[in-house]
Amino acid sequence: MVDSILTIVNLYNQDFCAYQDFRSVNPNNIFNWNFKELTLASRQYINQLFNSPRFFNNLKYMENAETILWLLSFNFNFTIVSCGDCPNLKLKEKWLNRNFCTYINEVKYINHAFVKFVGVNSCEHSDKSHIDMSDGILIDDSLTNLVTSNAKYKILFGKEKDWNIDNGDRYVRCENWIDVMHEIERLKFMHKGEEVFR
């Protein structure tokens, strides 16, 4: 939904550009969950960025995500489940409230859809398996979250990275939000007349 990799890489390029050994990094060249390609940055630096208002102030939607989510909101409710810790989860919810939702009588909506945010504390849970998704579609870039989820339909999101290699081709891979829209339309067509999702 949002381009965290782009944001981290842009901030890294800003912060380290004056260093002698600096080489500008292209976000498309990030393939490691721990951002090992950012050779001058420590793991602590990356973690601090993920937990900083600066990161969320620079965070943008992925290409076409905002439009596709708006279109889907006419037919679907959203539960956004995200892993993190404090303050990361609080900042995520604040970003969503500012960029994704409208409030009507203290209930969050995007168009006519209900929007719910569920923060999963990474210190307490290693994945999202404790969240009941049995009546919905899980779109996730983490293979672990797909494997452990009870979601009715599962979409592996994003280009192949070291954290989402699906050697068994168990899941439909959507590399972008246009692909997601097409896959959801395909699911709706396959199950025409059935209540596929609540």
What are these regions (language model features)?
Residues 160-198:
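Charged phosphate-binding loop/patch that engages nucleotide di/tri-phosphates or the phosphate backbone
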Residues 36-52, 76-78:
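Short, basic/glycine-rich phosphate-binding loops at helix/coil junctions
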Residues 77-79, 106, 137, 155:
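A structural signal for isolated positions on well-ordered beta-strands in alpha/beta enzyme cores
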Residues 1-44:
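Active-site neighborhood of HAD-like aspartate-dependent phosphohydrolases
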